[in-house]
Amino acid sequence: MLRRSIHTTKILQKPNATSHIWSDFTTRPSSLSIQSSKVKNYLFQKKASLDPPSISRRSNRIKYSPPEHIDEIFRMSYDFLEQRSSKFYELANKTKNPLKKDALLIKAEINNPEVQYNFQFNNKLNNVKDIIDYDVPVYRHLGKQHWESYGQMLLMQRLETLAAIPDTLPTLVPRAEVNIKFPFSTGVNKWIEPGEFLSSNVTSMRPIFKIQEYELVNVEKQLYTVLIVNPDVPDLSNDSFKTALCYGLVNINLTYNDNLIDPRKFHSSNIIADYLPPVPEKNAGKQRFVVWVFRQPLIEDKQGPNMLEIDRKELSRDDFDIRQFTKKYNLTAIGAHIWRSEWDAKVAAVREKYGLPPGRVFSRVRR
């Protein structure tokens, strides 16, 4: 019977002081540590004297028996990875290129069990900065992987299946995760799935956006533009449809963690087109409402942020050309979202609330 022997001389060497990089929190963010003392004590206990806190029932905790020598193997692996992490930190401190430095910092923390625990067992969307801090490169890396594994694919499938691409913009290379909810209308604190049908009552008040950047950006200077457009407004004179601008925001500043675009936070100067809720007309069919998020052009040599100056009087909300708008102001699309709506019994009340005229009623035969 053949046995595989593993040479562990280097691993079992007594580590020096600099190798304890993961356990020294004098300069490290607290988000790189497990916040639960019970979980942390169990993870790093020297003897298997504690019951696993992840098992809720006491009877099951008592029955639990860990694999033989698992604690010794874990400690050996932890010491090895921690020593290797310190080398990546040394390289990162010598590197001036921001992208290369981020890559080294990710390698230094990607195998940290505390980081993996924090990300896997906590809310990634409504993140708490003390647990999942997107200012830290490794959390942005893990967040991007998680988003690309499902959320990004779902978004692109809905945008292409519902023909929001190319009916609004020709294409999208998604770089940031965009989420939207309407908490002020019905009080339902729910993030909307792309392509979901929403009643006119739900969308009757302004939404909240969450824009999660995963790439390295200059958060002090980078500004954003957010547009909501409806490409399904009936255009009877041309026997076609036209695009309406439902909401427009510019010069929005975001950070990796403070990234909620909330009407209670931004100024009126950020609004180029105030919110007009979806009010589909009867028998007009299903209408798509597409959210586009753009990075505004960034001038690195400029001291402050590059503010867009847009003449609101020149905007044609009823016949909005989003392609011309993005080209004129050199905007880069980084994310999108979409929901759908159709006529329902609440539309008349929403129209009255916003001072809009009664909607038309379409029939099979034009009158």
Curated annotation (Swiss-Prot):
Transit peptide: 1-29
GO terms, biological process: mitochondrial cytochrome c oxidase assembly; mitochondrial translation
Subunit record text: Component of the mitochondrial large ribosomal subunit (mt-LSU). Mature yeast 74S mitochondrial ribosomes consist of a small (37S) and a large (54S) subunit. The 37S small subunit contains a 15S ribosomal RNA (15S mt-rRNA) and 34 different proteins. The 54S large subunit contains a 21S rRNA (21S mt-rRNA) and 46 different proteins.
Localization in the cell: Mitochondrion
Lineage, highest ranks first: Eukaryota, Fungi, Dikarya, Ascomycota, Saccharomycotina
Keyword Ribonucleoprotein: yes
Organism expressing this protein natively: Saccharomyces cerevisiae (strain ATCC 204508 / S288c) (Baker's yeast)
Protein name: Large ribosomal subunit protein mL38
Pfam families referenced in this protein's UniProt entry, alphabetically: PBP
